[in-house]
Amino acid sequence: VARPRYDLASIGVGIVHLGLGAFHRAHGAVYADDLLARDPRWGICGVSMKTPRAVAPLAAQDGLYTLLLKDPSGTTARVVGSVRETMFAPGDPRALVRRMADPRVHVVTLTVTEKGYCHDPATGRLDLAHPDVRHDLAHPGEPVSAVGLLAAALDERRRTGAGALNVVCCDNLPHNGRVLEGLVSSYAATRTPELANWIATHAAF
């Protein structure tokens, strides 16, 4: 069984991932695991958006889990150690916003499925009538949607001088980065033009 080739205690969190499901654990987290052998800054804070059951087993195992790789020659096992923290978003959204606003975090990635973007797929626009969006606009300090969380974190980075952020949509959406940028910018403009302007120059999607 292959094990991490780095000191777990030396790893910092440079990535926050929203939607810690099987796809991310088998792909994005593995790429980060490969990188950590050379650069300890890119540990992951993995976030479950819907249920604590997605993160409870990982938390009990210090973030470690085993990936099975199958090919015609057989099956190999690998322990992945890149997930250094776990969070349940509805449990403490303010803490999650602070985590994404940490200046040591440079990347937020997402696998929240198409429905998780609270948008109209036909137009690519934010659905302002969506219950989660309405909640977030009324309670911006305690967002529940991915768009609201991103906007809150970007606003916190703006206010604290934490710097720019790279936001990477890993879901199967046409023009996913451009769509997500439009959603977050639209939401931000509804709240404050200053935030929307800051996002235009300090966030990459």
Write out the residue ranges for each language-model feature.
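Non-transmembrane, aqueous-exposed alpha-helical and coiled segments at domain scale
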Residues: 1-205
